[in-house]
Curated annotation (Swiss-Prot):
GO terms for biological process: adaptive immune response; immune response. Disulfide bonds join 23-88. Residues 57-88 are annotated as: Framework-3. Residues 98-108 are annotated as: Framework-4. Keywords: Adaptive immunity, Disulfide bond, Immunity, Immunoglobulin. This is Ig kappa chain V-V region W3082. Residues 35-49 are annotated as: Framework-2. Residues 50-56 are annotated as: Complementarity-determining-2. SMART domains: IG, IGv. GO terms for cellular component: immunoglobulin complex.
Length: 108
């Protein structure tokens, strides 16, 4: 199975900050990767697909990039509403696999 190693597991940042999180695939090529945001009690929301394509309606402060088997989600100019857990999903190789998640908290 392809393991998606996500880091960090938690992150605390201030409003207006730029934050990044990464997922690294343990193996494979041409991995199709999505990023999701999940808030407590809510269904996951697709942010980015194809590693870097922003889903319709998602603010442009979210961006995704890839370098080989390393994938990065960046949030620029952090807002209160961005407090959530973020996770990646590879859906190229069966079984599809998720990263462990990054819990983003806002520093007060």
């Amino acid at each position: 199975d392809v393991q998606m190693i996500q880091s960090p597991s938690s992150l605390s940042a201030s409003l207006g900050d730029i934050v990044t999180m990464t997922c690294q695939a343990s193996q494979g090529t041409n991995i199709n990767l999505n990023w999701f945001q999940q808030k407590p009690g809510k269904a996951p929301k697709l942010l980015i697909y194809g590693a870097s394509i922003l889903e319709d309606g998602v603010p442009s402060r979210f961006s995704g990039s890839r370098y080989g088997t390393d994938f990065t989600l960046t949030i620029s100019s952090l807002e209160d509403e961005d407090m959530a857990t973020y996770f990646c999903l590879q859906h190229t190789y069966l079984p599809y696999t998720f990263g462990g998640g990054t819990k983003l908290e806002i520093k007060r």
